[in-house]
């Protein structure tokens, strides 16, 4: 029964500062590093052995993936990085304090931007200091593929080809898969995996820790879903 382990990156410096992050490439906080290490230890304790790992091209997810693999004694496992697993792009909200954004735009409007399935936040200008246009890590992409703002619907549309081309085939081959990604890119894939409605996914939250595990049958029907927890003494 193949397993898929989702690990949202450990707490980032901007999570700690309560800032909208999106595609901004911020680092893990000290606590976030500890969370990634603990994720690896939980994976080792659970005896889960991976055949392949996937992550985004943002350092907080890459570092979480590397630490989780290191502390589960699986640092040799191949890791594939893809922009399609990046966090949702928060557009013009990127870098803003969430409380300041609410004061400026109103609590209700910010809540709609954050939690609705298909409402886009304000677009990011191409000359914004956080723009992905011109960023070397996206040099191989057509400029039209680089977003200026995303909602969860668009995030799923972006992540879905990677699921269909890479992750799902690996699981169908019976491989155990690790995905180190982000709250909203994981939520998007969970919507696909569990066939959730647009309304149902709105109530789904993915914590920075611990990792989330799915077990599948041969047709990728979910047989079990749980968060890793320390074994009781």
From Swiss-Prot:
The lineage of its organism: Bacteria, Bacillati, Bacillota, Bacilli, Lactobacillales. The active site is at 9 (tele-phosphohistidine intermediate), 87 (proton donor/acceptor). Pathway: Carbohydrate degradation; glycolysis; pyruvate from D-glyceraldehyde 3-phosphate: step 3/5. GO terms for molecular function: mannan binding; phosphoglycerate mutase activity. It catalyses: (2R)-2-phosphoglycerate = (2R)-3-phosphoglycerate. Belongs to the phosphoglycerate mutase family. BPG-dependent PGAM subfamily. The record marks 182 as: Transition state stabilizer. It comes from Lactococcus lactis subsp. lactis (strain IL1403) (Streptococcus lactis). SUPFAM superfamilies: Phosphoglycerate mutase-like. Catalyzes the interconversion of 2-phosphoglycerate and 3-phosphoglycerate. Pfam families: His_Phos_1. This is 2,3-bisphosphoglycerate-dependent phosphoglycerate mutase. Its EC number is 5.4.2.11. Keywords: Gluconeogenesis, Glycolysis, Isomerase. It comes from the Bacteria. CDD domains: HP_PGM_like. The gene is gpmA. One of its GO terms (biological process) is gluconeogenesis. It is an enzyme of class 5 (isomerase). Substrate binds at residues 8-15, 21-22, 60, 87-90, 98, 114-115, 183-184. The keyword Methyltransferase does not apply. One of its GO terms (cellular component) is cell surface.
């Amino acid at each position: 029964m193949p397993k898929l382990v989702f690990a949202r990156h450990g707490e980032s410096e901007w999570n700690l500062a309560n800032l909208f992050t999106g595609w901004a490439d911020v680092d893990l906080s000290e606590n976030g590093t500890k969370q990634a290490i603990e994720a690896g230890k939980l994976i080792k304790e659970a005896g889960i052995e991976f055949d392949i790992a996937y992550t985004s091209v943002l350092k907080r997810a890459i570092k979480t993936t590397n630490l989780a693999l290191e502390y589960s004694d699986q640092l040799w496992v191949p890791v594939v990085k893809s922009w399609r697993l990046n966090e949702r792009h928060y557009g013009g909200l990127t870098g803003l304090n969430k409380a300041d954004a609410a004061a400026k735009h109103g609590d209700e409007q910010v809540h709609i931007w954050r939690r609705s399935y298909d409402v886009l936040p304000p677009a990011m200008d191409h000359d914004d200091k956080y723009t992905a246009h011109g960023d070397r890590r996206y040099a191989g992409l057509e400029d039209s593929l680089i977003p200026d703002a995303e909602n969860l619907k668009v995030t799923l549309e972006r992540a879905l080809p990677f699921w269909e081309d890479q992750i799902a085939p690996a699981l169908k081959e019976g491989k155990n898969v690790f995905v180190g990604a982000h709250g909203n890119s994981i939520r998007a894939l969970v919507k696909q995996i569990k066939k959730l409605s647009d309304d149902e996914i709105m109530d789904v939250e993915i914590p920075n820790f611990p990792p989330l595990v799915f077990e599948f049958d041969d047709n990728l029907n979910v047989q079990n879903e749980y968060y890793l927890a320390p074994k009781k003494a």
